[in-house]
């Protein structure tokens, strides 16, 4: 959890108190877990006391902006180490609490105690638990098969693994052979394919130190925080969530085994900062996949899944999907339709595991469009057919041929036609922001007769807002284009009001750097200007106003909000209608946009 409640959160101090109260009923309840329990409670108490010392009022929620200070007060190297310790402590308390209630519950169900159902390979269902009914095998392969059979039985039944069985395996110290034979690999893949029931099983194995015996590279990912407003899980839990989501998508791909394995491993490089997690992940999986029993060809695919796991979502949300350079570039990187479909499913599984802001109908449609166009090219189809643009449409051209202004809003789309002039795009963008709307994507077009077209795909900033009042929006656009609406001044007023009414939403301390990036490779006839910045009211208006001042022609735009920041991409041309390759001009654009982002 990004901002854990140290007292009332799952695995927090209240749960620890409950364990203490249960111990009054059963003095032997924590006898074997005393060291783990005491260490976990100490971490949580220390963090809570340090947090209270920093607040003038009681607070048990360890907010993101307080984590660096609390970490320093407690002597942690940084906030990541603090949050990893807190997450690990909470998991320990959570597991101990669940185990305690399970033992007490089973103690009151005498009818279950002596019922035994044999599941094979020494695995039994007894007393409502999955247990091993024979010694751990002396040979590593046989012991690994036993452990995975137990894990599979727990996932399939939804029952807990018996504590004695876990203690036995933990004490046995068996390691997994290298490379894995098929009987181990197949069982592990089956465990991943069991979906959500797999998650508590993996977390149980991890609690007992068994997950790192299965995959040693898992260790640095354990309880590792992802300290941004976009992710809701630690790295290890995120990987499990992604694999569980992928299990529900296996019907879409030719190789379900590669999909779930790739989902489990796609972010494993995040356990090894400060290097780029994708680069590290590629190196890890190049070595790890063969050890897990995947042959050379499958290893190449798994490595490609790690290398390109952000390719589809990044391109779909930041690049023009009607530009042949976009589709050609993705096709060249992916290489085949089967790999493309694996990446498409991985994108969905990964995004859903990230958080509610990371996946929705709009993003899903963009990824699907990109994947389908790329698949068409990879299957031998014409790239011209794949990127045949539907913008401007026949209706758009008919409106432009009338040589008069037209402002129309319907559904989630605002379409504006007017005589071409500098700043038209930015004025409309400003009106959109004034009306409490977020821009998801935008496109612009100018014809030889001096008419301009702008189309904005929008959604309300407030998800609970009523339907868009298009009459009001259209009236504001008309006034702005006539010079009768002070767009910039009104946006400044709205920004001040927004900050006063929603102070907790402004998070300037979030770890994110403003950047302006130029891409002259993706498109054959436009320069892509990518702007990464903290979100703010009217930001799109200020950026595009600055571009207009520099005589940049905006052909299309992709706008994406990621938690508290945005990644906007603009396809722009110079006055002659070409790409911008003059270094001095690019530097001036960067200087101007940098000033906007710092304001």
State what each model feature region is.
Residues 175-185, 189, 246, 289, ...:
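Conserved catalytic alpha/beta cores of large enzymes that bind or transform nucleotide phosphates
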Residues 1-229:
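Non-catalytic interface/linker regions that flank or bridge core catalytic/transmembrane domains
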Residues 16, 47, 205, 242, ...:
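His-Asp-centered metal-binding catalytic motifs of divalent-metal-dependent phosphohydrolases/nucleases
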Residues 44, 178-180, 228-229, 288, ...:
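Short low-complexity, flexible loop/linker segments enriched in glycine and/or proline
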Residues 117-135, 157, 207-273, 510-514, ...:
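Active-site-adjacent "gating/activation" loops or surface patches in catalytic cores
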Residues 8-15, 35-43, 85, 197, ...:
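Secondary-structure capping and boundary motifs in well-ordered enzyme cores
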Residues 26, 213, 248-257, 271-276, ...:
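Secondary-structure transition/capping motifs at alpha-helix termini
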């Amino acid at each position: 959890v990004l901002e854990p409640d140290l007292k009332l959160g799952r695995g927090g101090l209240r749960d620890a108190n409950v364990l203490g109260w249960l111990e009054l009923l059963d003095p032997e309840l924590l006898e074997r877990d005393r060291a783990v329990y005491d260490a976990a409670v100490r971490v949580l108490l220390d963090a809570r006391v340090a947090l209270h010392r920093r607040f003038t009022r009681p607070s048990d929620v360890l907010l993101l902006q307080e984590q660096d200070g609390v970490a320093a007060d407690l002597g942690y190297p940084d906030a990541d180490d603090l949050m990893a310790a807190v997450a690990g402590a909470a998991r320990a308390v959570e597991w101990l609490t669940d185990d305690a209630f399970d033992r007490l519950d089973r103690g009151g169900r005498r009818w279950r105690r002596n019922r035994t159902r044999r599941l094979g390979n020494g695995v039994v269902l007894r007393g409502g638990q999955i247990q091993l009914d024979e010694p751990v095998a002396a040979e590593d392969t046989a012991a690994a098969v036993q452990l995975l059979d137990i894990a599979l039985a727990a996932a399939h039944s939804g029952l807990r693994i018996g504590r004695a069985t876990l203690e036995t395996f933990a004490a046995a110290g068996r390691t997994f052979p290298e490379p894995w034979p098929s009987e181990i690999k197949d069982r592990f893949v089956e465990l991943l394919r069991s979906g959500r029931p797999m998650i508590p099983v993996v977390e149980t194995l991890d609690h007992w130190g068994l997950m790192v015996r299965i995959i040693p590279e898992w260790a640095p990912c354990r309880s590792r925080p992802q300290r941004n407003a976009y992710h809701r899980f630690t790295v290890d839990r995120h990987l499990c969530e992604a694999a569980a989501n992928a299990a529900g998508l296996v019907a879409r791909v030719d190789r379900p085994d590669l999909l779930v394995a790739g989902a489990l491993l796609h972010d494993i490089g995040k356990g090894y900062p400060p290097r780029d997690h994708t680069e590290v992940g590629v190196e890890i999986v190049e070595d790890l996949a063969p050890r897990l029993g995947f042959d050379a060809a499958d290893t190449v695919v798994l490595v490609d899944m790690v290398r390109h796991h952000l390719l589809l979502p990044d391109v779909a949300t930041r690049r023009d999907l009607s530009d042949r350079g976009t589709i050609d570039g993705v096709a060249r990187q992916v290489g085949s339709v089967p790999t493309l479909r694996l990446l498409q499913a991985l994108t969905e599984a990964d995004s859903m595991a990230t958080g509610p802001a990371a996946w929705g109908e709009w993003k899903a449609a963009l990824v699907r469009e990109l994947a389908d166009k790329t698949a068409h090219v990879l299957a031998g189809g014409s790239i011209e057919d794949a990127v045949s643009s539907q913008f401007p449409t026949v209706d758009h051209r008919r409106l432009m041929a009338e040589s008069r202004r037209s402002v129309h809003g319907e559904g989630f789309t605002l379409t504006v036609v007017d005589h071409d002039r500098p700043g038209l795009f930015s004025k409309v963008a400003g009106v959109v922001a004034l009306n409490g709307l977020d821009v998801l994507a935008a496109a612009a077009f100018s014809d030889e007769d001096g008419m301009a077209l702008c189309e904005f795909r929008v959604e309300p900033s407030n998800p609970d807002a009523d339907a868009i009042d298009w009459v009001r929006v259209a009236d504001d656009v008309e006034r702005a284009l006539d010079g009768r609406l002070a767009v910039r001044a009104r946006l400044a007023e709205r920004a001040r009001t927004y900050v006063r009414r929603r102070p907790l939403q402004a998070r300037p301390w979030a770890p994110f750097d403003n950047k302006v990036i130029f891409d002259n490779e993706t498109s054959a006839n436009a320069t892509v200007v990518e702007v990464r910045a903290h979100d703010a009211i009217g930001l799109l208006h200020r950026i595009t106003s600055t571009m207009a001042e520099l005589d940049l022609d905006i052909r299309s735009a992709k706008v994406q909000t990621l938690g508290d920041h945005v990644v906007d991409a603009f396809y722009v041309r110079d006055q002659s209608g070409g790409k911008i390759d003059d270094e001095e001009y690019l530097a001036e654009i960067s200087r101007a946009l940098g000033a906007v982002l710092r304001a």
